[in-house]
Amino acid sequence: MKPVMALVGRANVGKSTLFNRLTRSRDALVADFAGLTRDRHYGNGKQGRHEYIVIDTGGFEPDVASGIYREMARQTQQAIAEADVVVFVVDVRAGVTAQDHDIAHYLRRAGKPCVLAANKAEGMQQDQGGKWAEFYELGLGTVHPVSAAHGQGIRSLVEMALEPLSPPDDGADAAARDLPDADGVDGVDGVDGADGRIIRLAVAGRPNVGKSTLINTWLGEERLVAFDTPGTTRDAITVPFERNGQRFELVDTAGLRRKGKVFAAVEKFSVVKTLQAIESAHVVLLLLDASQGVTEQDAHIAGYILESGRAVVLAVNKWDATDDYQRQLLERSIETRLAFLKFASLHRISAKKRQGLGPLWTAIVQAHKAATCKMSTPVLTRLLLEAVQFQSPQRQGLFRPKMRYAHQGGMNPPVIVIHGNGLEHVTDTYKRFLEGRFRKEFDLVGTPLRIELKTSHNPYVDEGRGGR
């Protein structure tokens, strides 16, 4: 499970600049949901071996009583509650303010692990007397100098914040992370894989689309047996169950609550919980509301599913409550706003009336099978050469890319690595053409497919030029 890091501090200390720096490795704003998280921005980042979710907050005034600043304070308090570690950002050039002391007092009472980041420290030495000493008066331990604008001290800041939350990293573990797991599932822990083994499933969607209704319908079916598994504080709640001989593990996104001997889901939307559930799932069922079409929030969640490389099934709930005109608008909305998920199957359901639910299970199993598909090098190479013979890549100047062979580079999602010469000139259009050929051959419905191009360089080219 990815740890969550919240950036907290008063206004104009550089939190957003630091947020952009921390998320730059994947260059994606994961969630900026109007209304729900107006003052909290969620991003996904990676520094070294650490992958994390980072939350950017507005300026924090813990004791403000009313108005918009009270709402900003409430949003920041929620971010602190969601976080595993807090990075308290201060402005080293402005020095410690009364507001900094108020925030530090609140953080000490909150009891969360906290790292003090002194921003705008470019060109400053930490032995410059009182300028640094005053920050130790905040009572939060070591002062860590950074420059978000220049990228200085960022890696060590992440190490300091996340190292206590990370498992031991020995050589064997590092090597294992570079290869697909033995069961064919890359990057998801505690799962068994395909062919009747456990499939970890997350039901994602914005509030009030019917996640809890759908989950409760599933958990209440006689053919579906649910049982409790205790988890740790930082793990998402999961409910193992079985349907038609296939074992599943439902990852909580709607808010599962224990009631006697059964689980019940209540509609409680949490951005962090949703992102973490997507990351830990094999397959994500993205639930849409037929009466509202595809919203910005839906598109944000869908984008994160794609970025995470998870298999996905689309389901439009409340289909029975729409007329023909609404359905036409919805179909167009899906085609335009979710065009990047055109590889996913689409199902029209009514969770309340239990309509259309049967095919969902088949689609979920098929999506997982596609995501963990094994593709042999001879077959991939044959398909590649046949595709090139059918349609060669476009010539770029004097050079035409030369594709030689292909092999599988990973699973969940499937990765196909193509080797050759001049492949940096291959266009995105041609990559989509190749993707279509591979998808058709291996029936890759419901899973992203990543194609990596690796150019072989002639070591004698530069030597020959140098001798002229």
From Swiss-Prot:
GO terms for molecular function: GTP binding; ribosome binding. GTP 1 binds at residues 9-16, 56-60, 119-122. The keyword Nucleotide-binding applies. One of its GO terms (biological process) is ribosome biogenesis. Residues 3-169, 199-372 form the EngA-type G domain. Keywords: GTP-binding, Nucleotide-binding, Repeat, Ribosome biogenesis. Residues 373-457 form the KH-like domain. PROSITE patterns: G_ENGA (PS51712). GTP 2 binds at residues 205-212, 252-256, 317-320. CDD domains: EngA1 (cd01894), EngA2 (cd01895). InterPro entries: G_ENGA (IPR031166), GTP-bd (IPR006073), GTPase_Der (IPR016484), KH_dom-like (IPR032859), KH_dom-like_a/b (IPR015946), P-loop_NTPase (IPR027417), Small_GTP-bd (IPR005225). The keyword Zinc does not apply. Belongs to the TRAFAC class TrmE-Era-EngA-EngB-Septin-like GTPase superfamily. EngA (Der) GTPase family. GTPase that plays an essential role in the late steps of ribosome biogenesis. Associates with the 50S ribosomal subunit. HAMAP family: GTPase_Der. NCBIfam families: GTPase_EngA, small_GTP. This is GTPase Der. It comes from Verminephrobacter eiseniae (strain EF01-2). The gene is der.
